[in-house]
Amino acid sequence: MKVVFELSGEHPSLSPSEVIHCLKSEGVSYRYMDIFGSFLLVNIEGRADIKKVSQRLALSHLIDIYLFSTKPYLRHLLKKARKTKVDIEGSFRVRCENRSNKKLRSIDLEKKLGGIYADKHDVNLTNPDTEIRLLLSEELWFVGKKLFEVNRSQYEKRKANFRPFFLPISMHPRLARCMVNLSEVKAREKLLDPFCGTGGILIEAGLIGAEVMGSDIERWIAEGCKKNLRYYGIKGFEIENVDVGEIDIFGKVDAVVTDFPYGRASTTKKEPIEKLYKRAFLSISNVLKNRRKLVCAIPSIELIKIGCDYMDLVEVHPFRVHGNLTRYICIFTK
């Protein structure tokens, strides 16, 4: 079964990478096909539970069953649509997503494509049984059937200012969930955040069923993290007030996901940032199981290089936060 992931477009490399790592974490056999702008085409092998993947994703909007594709012209679209059999159950509507540079009226395309199917099926623009998706990229136009919609509004509801305990500088829940997904952690596996802060990463990991552990050098922050985890119904967590050099108390873990201190607004207890990173990478490499992943946000290329002395760097995604502030989302393996 071919499916199209409608990526959010928030980040050109993070969005498709999240999809691929999500598929792996849920044990979905797949064959990567291609990416066209914000549309990722994947061939799913066998019977896979794509719904679980949709429930994990943060940087996608929709997952569609692929029906056909055409050259990016209306005449090609309508010609192919007339020749291609499309199974429509009950009523339907057509929705167009234009991610190309062409100035086209989506509603006009929806009417023209919908007109082909309207002879045999009822149109329902508000609550259809089937939604036909028309996806416009620069290279190709895709037609598919909506399979699942990613619940992106949930992440807005979990922003830091809605939590019982928060600090001014906190990662957005969408990015936190994305990083958790990049780690390929599965439900009931152990995930550690050694710089847990208010618990944003642990909340997202706990909500997908991971067993979460975290530490912070400040006791009051560690206690605040516990309060947030309880608020979101996360069970069985373990939060300790310890230095990153003491995280071996957690034993071996399946994934480490963390937002490293930046040295300015973050607490380093006046320790030089390079020394802290060396100790952190050493400790993380000692607790992480073999062939598993560390996913981390790091503020500079120079600090990424420190990690390369301890683990293998497999992916780097520059992520501009605002102004001149750029984080690098990195995936290391042991």
What are these regions (language model features)?
Residues 1-59, 80, 99-100, 104, ...:
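Class I S-adenosyl-L-methionine-dependent methyltransferase catalytic core
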Residues 88-91, 187-188:
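Phosphate-coordination loops involved in phosphoryl transfer and adenosine-cofactor binding
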Residues 51-85:
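A broadly used, surface-exposed interaction patch
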Residues 67-72, 122-124, 128:
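Short glycine-rich, low-complexity/disordered patches
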Residues 22, 77-80, 84, 112, ...:
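Residues that form generic nucleotide/phosphate-binding pockets
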Residues 83-87, 123-125, 135:
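Short, charge-rich binding segments
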